[in-house]
């Protein structure tokens, strides 16, 4: 853990310099969130709705890709938010992104073809396509509306935690609703 932290800290400066190549400027608090993530390599971003969690996630992915720290990443989002993520991504970054969709054989081919860039999938799709996702071997995983993995016992939580990317970014507006265990599950 300490070794990973040192590696992230050492690479953060180069990645931070790439924020200047974004299509839009970040607010100071957004830049601070991205910087914290880049230095730590793992972060639970629990801002209120409307403060730009998605923009911060896209900026972090952009910086890591442009600095050569990652070549491919996975964005797991509620299915209803896929188009919003793609729109926000294209407004913020020029790094390649695609939504994986279609019949099972079409999705399998899309994972194989995505050697560089980022893919957007839904939580249910993660369950159906897990072997393809694992073979895709993302170097960063971003979870939006991460309260979906608050319960350790759910398949979604187990599948997400079975992935082992170098970078993890967890986004939620509600990190803890009822029990401390929910927060612990998000941090795991």
Show which residues each predicted segment covers.
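Charged, low-complexity
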Residues: 1-43, 87, 95, 113-119, ...
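Catalytic acidic motif of RecA-like/P-loop NTPases
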Residues: 50, 124-127, 147-150, 174-175
């Amino acid at each position: 853990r300490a070794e990973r932290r040192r590696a992230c800290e050492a690479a953060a400066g180069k990645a931070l310099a790439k924020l200047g190549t974004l299509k839009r400027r970040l607010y100071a608090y957004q830049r601070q969130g991205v910087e914290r993530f880049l230095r730590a390599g793992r972060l639970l971003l629990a801002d209120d709705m409307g403060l730009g969690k998605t923009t911060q996630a896209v900026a972090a992915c952009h910086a890591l890709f442009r600095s050569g720290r990652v070549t491919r990443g996975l964005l797991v989002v509620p299915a209803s938010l896929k188009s919003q993520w793609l729109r926000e991504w294209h407004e913020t970054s020029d790094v390649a992104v695609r939504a994986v969709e279609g019949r099972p054989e079409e999705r399998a081919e899309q994972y194989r073809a995505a050697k560089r860039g980022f893919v957007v999938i839904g939580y249910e799709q993660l369950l159906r396509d897990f072997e393809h996702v694992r073979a895709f071997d993302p170097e960063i995983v971003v979870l939006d509306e991460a309260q979906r993995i608050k319960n350790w016992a759910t398949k979604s939580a187990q599948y997400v935690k079975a992935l082992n990317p170098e970078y993890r970014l967890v986004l939620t507006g509600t990190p803890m609703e009822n029990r401390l265990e929910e927060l612990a599950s998000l941090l795991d």
